């Protein structure tokens, strides 16, 4: 018989640097999950992606065991990295804060394709371009 799911927790954590401190501690501690066990498993699973922000979905079961699924880094994080920015524009449609090339958009779309609701790379690129525009990043050829 399958275990009963008690909760699903979504977090965005830096790869290889999860600690029992907030945000991990409060989110998982109140559900009775062994924090150190989660941190060790997450850090081991994401050690090769150091420096990136990794979204993770943690499924907590009735017996306090857990499983987790890591996703690809957020498009906004990858765009900021490609454009060498610390943050997006405060006024996205009016103020341009950086530029990315179509080639960089394609690379980001390749990375994100498995998590995006897109059938082909062109559709994934359009999604990433929309994210770039909403951040005040200009797409150039």
Swiss-Prot record:
<dbReference type="Pfam" id="PF00298">
    <property type="entry name" value="Ribosomal_L11"/>
</dbReference>
<dbReference type="InterPro" id="IPR036796">
    <property type="entry name" value="Ribosomal_uL11_N_sf"/>
</dbReference>
<keyword id="KW-0687">Ribonucleoprotein</keyword>
<dbReference type="GO" id="GO:0003735">
    <property type="term" value="F:structural constituent of ribosome"/>
</dbReference>
<keyword id="KW-0694">RNA-binding</keyword>
<dbReference type="InterPro" id="IPR000911">
    <property type="entry name" value="Ribosomal_uL11"/>
</dbReference>
<dbReference type="InterPro" id="IPR020785">
    <property type="entry name" value="Ribosomal_uL11_CS"/>
</dbReference>
<comment type="similarity">
    <text>Belongs to the universal ribosomal protein uL11 family.</text>
</comment>
<keyword id="KW-0699">rRNA-binding</keyword>
<comment type="function">
    <text>Forms part of the ribosomal stalk which helps the ribosome interact with GTP-bound translation factors.</text>
</comment>
<keyword id="KW-0488">Methylation</keyword>
<keyword id="KW-0689">Ribosomal protein</keyword>
<dbReference type="Pfam" id="PF03946">
    <property type="entry name" value="Ribosomal_L11_N"/>
</dbReference>
<dbReference type="GO" id="GO:0022625">
    <property type="term" value="C:cytosolic large ribosomal subunit"/>
</dbReference>
<dbReference type="GO" id="GO:0070180">
    <property type="term" value="F:large ribosomal subunit rRNA binding"/>
</dbReference>
<dbReference type="InterPro" id="IPR020784">
    <property type="entry name" value="Ribosomal_uL11_N"/>
</dbReference>
<comment type="subunit">
    <text>Part of the ribosomal stalk of the 50S ribosomal subunit. Interacts with L10 and the large rRNA to form the base of the stalk. L10 forms an elongated spine to which L12 dimers bind in a sequential fashion forming a multimeric L10(L12)X complex.</text>
</comment>
<protein>
    <recommendedName>
        <fullName>Large ribosomal subunit protein uL11</fullName>
    </recommendedName>
</protein>
<dbReference type="InterPro" id="IPR006519">
    <property type="entry name" value="Ribosomal_uL11_bac-typ"/>
</dbReference>
<dbReference type="InterPro" id="IPR020783">
    <property type="entry name" value="Ribosomal_uL11_C"/>
</dbReference>
<dbReference type="InterPro" id="IPR036769">
    <property type="entry name" value="Ribosomal_uL11_C_sf"/>
</dbReference>
<dbReference type="GO" id="GO:0006412">
    <property type="term" value="P:translation"/>
</dbReference>
């Amino acid at each position: 018989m399958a275990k009963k799911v008690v909760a699903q927790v979504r977090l965005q954590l830096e790869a290889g640097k999860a600690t029992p401190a907030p945000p991990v501690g409060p989110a998982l501690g109140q559900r009775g999950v062994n924090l150190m066990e989660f941190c060790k498993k997450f850090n081991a699973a994401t050690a090769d992606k150091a420096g990136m922000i990794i979204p993770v979905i943690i499924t907590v079961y009735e017996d306090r065991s857990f499983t987790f699924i890591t996703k690809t880094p957020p498009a906004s994080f990858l765009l900021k990295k490609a454009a060498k920015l610390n943050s997006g524009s405060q006024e996205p449609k009016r103020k341009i804060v950086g530029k990315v090339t179509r080639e960089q958009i394609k690379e980001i779309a390749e990375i994100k394709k498995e998590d995006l609701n897109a059938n082909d790379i062109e559709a994934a690129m359009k999604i990433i371009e929309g994210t770039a525009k909403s951040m005040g990043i200009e797409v150039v050829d």
